[in-house]
A protein has these predicted regions:
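Sec-dependent N-terminal signal peptides of Gram-positive bacterial secreted proteins and lipoproteins
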Residues: 1-24
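N-terminal hydrophobic signal/anchor transmembrane helix of membrane proteins
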Residues: 8, 97-105, 111-115
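Exported/periplasmic ABC-transporter solute-binding proteins
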Residues: 19-55, 74, 78-82, 93-94, ...
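Conserved beta-strand core positions
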Residues: 38, 64-66, 119
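Signal peptide-proximal N-terminal region
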Residues: 55-67
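A short linear hydrophobic-aromatic micro-motif
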Residues: 65-66, 109-110, 213
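Conserved strand-loop elements at the edges of beta-sheets that form or border functional pockets
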Residues: 70
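Periplasmic-binding protein-like
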Residues: 87-91
Length: 264
Protein backbone atom coordinates (compact mmCIF):
# COMPACT_ATOMS: atom_id res chain seq x y z
CA UNK A 1 0.00 0.00 0.00
CA UNK A 2 2.82 2.37 0.90
CA UNK A 3 4.48 1.56 -2.42
CA UNK A 4 1.25 2.28 -4.33
CA UNK A 5 0.83 5.59 -2.49
CA UNK A 6 4.38 6.61 -3.34
CA UNK A 7 3.83 5.83 -7.02
CA UNK A 8 0.60 7.84 -7.11
CA UNK A 9 2.28 10.81 -5.39
CA UNK A 10 5.19 10.73 -7.82
CA UNK A 11 2.80 10.66 -10.77
CA UNK A 12 0.81 13.59 -9.43
CA UNK A 13 4.01 15.57 -8.86
CA UNK A 14 5.14 14.90 -12.43
CA UNK A 15 1.81 16.11 -13.83
CA UNK A 16 1.95 19.26 -11.71
CA UNK A 17 5.54 19.92 -12.76
CA UNK A 18 4.60 19.49 -16.39
CA UNK A 19 1.75 21.94 -16.07
CA UNK A 20 4.00 24.40 -14.26
CA UNK A 21 6.63 24.17 -16.98
CA UNK A 22 4.03 24.67 -19.67
CA UNK A 23 2.66 27.70 -17.83
CA UNK A 24 6.14 29.18 -17.49
CA UNK A 25 6.77 28.54 -21.18
CA UNK A 26 3.50 30.21 -22.14
CA UNK A 27 4.28 33.18 -19.90
CA UNK A 28 7.71 33.54 -21.49
CA UNK A 29 6.20 33.38 -24.97
CA UNK A 30 3.53 35.90 -24.00
CA UNK A 31 6.14 38.24 -22.55
CA UNK A 32 8.20 38.04 -25.74
CA UNK A 33 5.22 39.22 -27.75
CA UNK A 34 4.19 42.11 -25.52
CA UNK A 35 3.44 45.28 -27.54
CA UNK A 36 6.43 47.59 -27.82
CA UNK A 37 6.35 51.24 -28.90
CA UNK A 38 9.86 52.14 -30.05
CA UNK A 39 10.54 55.89 -30.19
CA UNK A 40 13.12 56.95 -32.78
CA UNK A 41 14.35 60.56 -33.03
CA UNK A 42 15.90 61.13 -36.47
CA UNK A 43 17.23 64.04 -38.52
CA UNK A 44 14.70 65.41 -41.00
CA UNK A 45 16.91 64.43 -43.94
CA UNK A 46 16.31 60.76 -43.03
CA UNK A 47 12.51 60.97 -43.20
CA UNK A 48 11.82 59.05 -46.41
CA UNK A 49 14.33 56.25 -46.00
CA UNK A 50 13.58 55.71 -42.30
CA UNK A 51 9.85 55.53 -42.97
CA UNK A 52 10.54 52.65 -45.37
CA UNK A 53 12.82 50.92 -42.90
CA UNK A 54 10.30 51.34 -40.09
CA UNK A 55 7.52 49.71 -42.13
CA UNK A 56 9.74 46.74 -42.95
CA UNK A 57 10.72 46.32 -39.32
CA UNK A 58 7.10 46.40 -38.17
CA UNK A 59 6.20 43.79 -40.81
CA UNK A 60 8.85 41.45 -39.39
CA UNK A 61 8.01 42.30 -35.76
CA UNK A 62 4.19 42.60 -35.50
CA UNK A 63 4.35 43.42 -31.78
CA UNK A 64 6.54 46.51 -32.39
CA UNK A 65 5.30 49.94 -33.45
CA UNK A 66 8.08 52.30 -34.55
CA UNK A 67 7.23 55.93 -33.72
CA UNK A 68 9.44 58.45 -35.51
CA UNK A 69 10.10 62.01 -34.40
CA UNK A 70 11.78 63.98 -37.20
CA UNK A 71 13.33 67.41 -36.94
CA UNK A 72 16.60 69.28 -36.83
CA UNK A 73 19.31 67.40 -34.96
CA UNK A 74 19.70 70.34 -32.59
CA UNK A 75 16.02 70.40 -31.66
CA UNK A 76 15.99 66.64 -31.18
CA UNK A 77 19.08 66.83 -28.98
CA UNK A 78 17.42 69.44 -26.78
CA UNK A 79 14.24 67.39 -26.52
CA UNK A 80 16.24 64.35 -25.39
CA UNK A 81 18.18 66.42 -22.85
CA UNK A 82 14.85 67.69 -21.49
CA UNK A 83 13.56 64.16 -20.94
CA UNK A 84 11.75 63.60 -24.23
CA UNK A 85 10.72 60.03 -25.02
CA UNK A 86 13.41 58.51 -27.26
CA UNK A 87 14.94 55.05 -27.52
CA UNK A 88 17.30 55.85 -30.40
CA UNK A 89 18.79 58.98 -31.95
CA UNK A 90 19.94 59.34 -35.55
CA UNK A 91 21.76 62.67 -35.97
CA UNK A 92 22.91 64.50 -39.10
CA UNK A 93 26.08 65.68 -37.35
CA UNK A 94 28.54 64.61 -34.68
CA UNK A 95 28.06 67.80 -32.65
CA UNK A 96 24.65 66.88 -31.27
CA UNK A 97 25.61 63.27 -30.57
CA UNK A 98 28.80 64.43 -28.86
CA UNK A 99 26.72 66.64 -26.55
CA UNK A 100 24.47 63.74 -25.54
CA UNK A 101 27.46 61.48 -24.98
CA UNK A 102 29.17 64.12 -22.83
CA UNK A 103 25.97 64.39 -20.77
CA UNK A 104 26.02 60.63 -20.19
CA UNK A 105 22.75 60.03 -22.04
CA UNK A 106 23.91 57.33 -24.49
CA UNK A 107 23.86 53.60 -23.80
CA UNK A 108 27.45 52.37 -23.56
CA UNK A 109 28.89 50.86 -26.71
CA UNK A 110 25.92 51.61 -28.97
CA UNK A 111 27.15 54.71 -30.81
CA UNK A 112 28.18 54.14 -34.43
CA UNK A 113 28.84 56.21 -37.55
CA UNK A 114 26.16 55.17 -40.02
CA UNK A 115 26.13 57.38 -43.12
CA UNK A 116 27.81 60.21 -45.03
CA UNK A 117 26.24 62.99 -47.11
CA UNK A 118 27.22 66.13 -49.04
CA UNK A 119 25.88 69.68 -49.44
CA UNK A 120 24.64 71.01 -52.78
CA UNK A 121 23.35 74.32 -54.12
CA UNK A 122 19.82 74.13 -55.51
CA UNK A 123 17.50 76.44 -57.43
CA UNK A 124 13.84 76.08 -58.50
CA UNK A 125 13.53 73.74 -61.46
CA UNK A 126 11.21 76.09 -63.32
CA UNK A 127 11.47 79.87 -63.53
CA UNK A 128 14.49 80.22 -61.29
CA UNK A 129 17.35 82.68 -61.58
CA UNK A 130 20.19 81.73 -63.90
CA UNK A 131 22.96 80.77 -61.48
CA UNK A 132 25.41 77.90 -61.65
CA UNK A 133 27.90 78.48 -58.83
CA UNK A 134 28.16 79.46 -55.17
CA UNK A 135 29.89 82.72 -56.08
CA UNK A 136 26.76 83.88 -57.89
CA UNK A 137 24.82 83.87 -54.61
CA UNK A 138 26.18 87.40 -54.09
CA UNK A 139 24.40 88.66 -57.21
CA UNK A 140 21.91 91.50 -56.74
CA UNK A 141 19.44 89.54 -58.87
CA UNK A 142 18.85 87.15 -55.96
CA UNK A 143 16.40 88.22 -53.27
CA UNK A 144 16.36 85.24 -50.90
CA UNK A 145 18.89 82.48 -50.22
CA UNK A 146 17.58 79.68 -47.99
CA UNK A 147 19.88 78.21 -45.35
CA UNK A 148 19.38 76.00 -42.33
CA UNK A 149 19.41 77.82 -38.99
CA UNK A 150 23.09 77.49 -38.05
CA UNK A 151 22.78 77.06 -34.28
CA UNK A 152 20.70 73.89 -34.28
CA UNK A 153 20.40 72.66 -37.87
CA UNK A 154 23.46 70.74 -39.09
CA UNK A 155 22.97 71.66 -42.76
CA UNK A 156 22.97 75.30 -41.62
CA UNK A 157 26.25 74.77 -39.79
CA UNK A 158 27.82 73.13 -42.83
CA UNK A 159 26.45 75.92 -45.05
CA UNK A 160 28.08 78.60 -42.92
CA UNK A 161 31.39 76.71 -43.08
CA UNK A 162 31.14 76.53 -46.88
CA UNK A 163 30.16 80.17 -47.39
CA UNK A 164 32.84 81.33 -44.96
CA UNK A 165 35.50 79.26 -46.69
CA UNK A 166 34.41 80.72 -50.04
CA UNK A 167 34.54 84.23 -48.56
CA UNK A 168 30.92 85.12 -49.37
CA UNK A 169 29.02 84.64 -46.09
CA UNK A 170 28.93 88.34 -45.15
CA UNK A 171 27.87 89.29 -48.68
CA UNK A 172 24.70 87.17 -48.55
CA UNK A 173 23.62 87.60 -44.92
CA UNK A 174 21.14 90.34 -45.80
CA UNK A 175 19.28 88.03 -48.19
CA UNK A 176 19.55 84.84 -46.11
CA UNK A 177 16.39 83.21 -44.76
CA UNK A 178 16.75 80.44 -42.18
CA UNK A 179 14.77 77.22 -42.08
CA UNK A 180 14.06 75.16 -38.97
CA UNK A 181 15.32 72.04 -40.73
CA UNK A 182 16.63 70.98 -44.14
CA UNK A 183 13.17 70.06 -45.43
CA UNK A 184 11.96 73.62 -44.88
CA UNK A 185 14.92 74.93 -46.88
CA UNK A 186 14.06 72.47 -49.65
CA UNK A 187 10.38 73.49 -49.61
CA UNK A 188 11.20 77.20 -49.90
CA UNK A 189 13.33 76.64 -52.98
CA UNK A 190 10.91 74.14 -54.53
CA UNK A 191 8.05 76.64 -54.20
CA UNK A 192 10.10 79.52 -55.60
CA UNK A 193 9.90 81.49 -52.34
CA UNK A 194 13.71 81.42 -52.28
CA UNK A 195 15.94 81.90 -55.30
CA UNK A 196 18.47 79.33 -54.11
CA UNK A 197 19.33 77.20 -51.11
CA UNK A 198 21.86 74.84 -49.60
CA UNK A 199 20.62 71.35 -48.76
CA UNK A 200 21.92 67.82 -48.56
CA UNK A 201 22.33 65.98 -51.85
CA UNK A 202 19.89 63.34 -50.60
CA UNK A 203 17.15 65.93 -50.05
CA UNK A 204 17.65 67.47 -53.47
CA UNK A 205 17.35 63.99 -54.98
CA UNK A 206 13.81 63.42 -53.68
CA UNK A 207 12.34 66.64 -55.12
CA UNK A 208 11.26 67.00 -58.73
CA UNK A 209 10.84 70.76 -58.21
CA UNK A 210 14.50 71.70 -57.72
CA UNK A 211 17.72 71.19 -59.63
CA UNK A 212 21.27 70.96 -58.37
CA UNK A 213 23.59 73.57 -59.87
CA UNK A 214 26.74 72.96 -57.82
CA UNK A 215 28.26 70.72 -55.17
CA UNK A 216 30.14 72.18 -52.23
CA UNK A 217 33.83 72.24 -53.18
CA UNK A 218 36.05 69.72 -51.42
CA UNK A 219 37.62 71.02 -48.25
CA UNK A 220 35.02 73.70 -47.57
CA UNK A 221 33.32 71.91 -44.68
CA UNK A 222 33.72 69.09 -42.18
CA UNK A 223 32.79 65.59 -43.29
CA UNK A 224 29.03 65.15 -43.01
CA UNK A 225 28.70 62.05 -40.85
CA UNK A 226 25.42 60.69 -39.50
CA UNK A 227 25.96 58.92 -36.15
CA UNK A 228 23.35 56.75 -34.44
CA UNK A 229 23.04 55.57 -30.84
CA UNK A 230 20.66 54.09 -28.29
CA UNK A 231 19.67 56.26 -25.34
CA UNK A 232 20.67 55.04 -21.90
CA UNK A 233 17.15 55.50 -20.53
CA UNK A 234 15.50 53.47 -23.31
CA UNK A 235 12.58 51.46 -21.96
CA UNK A 236 13.12 48.84 -24.66
CA UNK A 237 16.87 48.29 -24.81
CA UNK A 238 16.78 44.87 -26.50
CA UNK A 239 14.34 46.03 -29.19
CA UNK A 240 16.38 49.20 -29.73
CA UNK A 241 19.54 47.12 -30.23
CA UNK A 242 17.69 44.87 -32.67
CA UNK A 243 16.35 47.86 -34.62
CA UNK A 244 19.79 49.47 -34.87
CA UNK A 245 21.20 46.20 -36.21
CA UNK A 246 18.27 45.98 -38.65
CA UNK A 247 18.95 49.50 -39.93
CA UNK A 248 22.53 48.44 -40.69
CA UNK A 249 21.77 45.20 -42.54
CA UNK A 250 22.71 44.68 -46.20
CA UNK A 251 19.20 45.33 -47.52
CA UNK A 252 19.00 48.68 -45.77
CA UNK A 253 22.53 49.63 -46.79
CA UNK A 254 21.29 49.30 -50.37
CA UNK A 255 18.23 51.35 -49.47
CA UNK A 256 20.33 54.17 -48.04
CA UNK A 257 22.49 54.12 -51.17
CA UNK A 258 19.33 54.37 -53.30
CA UNK A 259 18.52 57.63 -51.51
CA UNK A 260 22.00 58.96 -52.19
CA UNK A 261 23.68 58.34 -48.84
CA UNK A 262 27.17 56.93 -48.63
CA UNK A 263 27.08 54.03 -46.18
CA UNK A 264 29.90 53.90 -43.64
Amino acid sequence: MKKLFALLAAGLLAVMSGCGGQTASNESKSSAQEPVELHVSAAASLTDVMNEIGKDYEAEHPNVKVVFNYGSSGALQQAIENGGDADLFFSAAQKQMNALEKAGLLADGTRKDLLQNEVVLIVPKEGGKDISSFDQLTSDTLTHVALGEPKGVPVGQYSEEILTKLGILDAIKAKAVYGSDVRQVLAWVASGESDAGLVYATDAAISSDVRVVAKAPAGTHKDIIYPAAILKDSKHLDTAKDFLAFVSNDKNKERFAKYGFEVK
